[in-house]
Design a protein with these regions (language model features):
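Non-heme Fe(II)/2-oxoglutarate
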Residues: 6, 10-94
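Catalytic core of non-heme Fe(II) oxygenases with the double-stranded beta-helix
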Residues: 75, 79, 83-187
Length: 187
């Protein structure tokens, strides 16, 4: 009941069930600049799993506990995007931001469907350089036994209920970078 009332309060049912999409959160040049910076400077680690029963896919750079070890320009990006998230979804200020990280998938990886957790709101920001439907790279959601897709348009922010089963898809020819913010809904 608390979770549903919170979902109703923040109104994340605009595009499809509990998923909202915002375009042009940052300019294309800023998105490209930050993508290059993250790709070139962040320490990515292999080993993150989507479920306990699946092997690892992709790599992760987790900013959550990096503190002073984050480059100032990247810290600016993280704070700018967080402010944009709060601007679009003001009631997320009443939640606990518990994780910020970047997913990196190399071409033709095949991630698994998963949930992010109970009472979680997830925000994804697409840092890829371009949108090409033939390349793939979308986020897939299982909604009412169908797969719904949000294309990974550069500069796009998608906000969704972390209990929705979803997965990234990789691109065919270039890496896929997605910045993720995860919020815990209060009890």
């Amino acid at each position: 009941v608390v979770l549903q009332s919170f979902k109703d309060k923040i109104g994340i049912s605009i595009m499809m069930e509990n998923i909202t999409v915002y375009d042009d959160i940052l300019s294309p040049s800023d998105t490209s600049k930050y993508a290059e910076m993250i790709f070139g400077t962040c320490p990515f680690f292999y080993g993150e799993v989507d479920n306990e029963s699946t092997p690892p896919t992709g790599m992760v750079c987790d900013f959550t506990d990096m503190g002073e070890h984050i480059y100032p320009e990247i810290k600016t990006l993280l704070n700018t995007l967080l402010n944009k998230i709060y601007e679009k979804q003001p009631t997320l200020k009443d939640t606990q931001l518990y994780r910020i990280y970047v997913n990196l998938f190399t071409p033709n990886e095949n991630p698994y469907f998963h949930i992010d957790g109970e009472k979680t709101i997830t925000c994804l920001y697409y840092l890829n350089p371009q949108l090409s439907y033939d390349e793939g790279g979308e986020t897939q959601f299982i909604v009412d036994e169908d797969i719904k897709v949000v294309c990974s348009k550069p500069g796009r922010l998608v906000v969704f209920d972390g209990e929705i089963q979803h997965r990234a898809t990789s691109f065919r020819h270039y890496p896929r970078l997605t910045l993720a913010y995860k919020f815990l809904i209060p009890q």
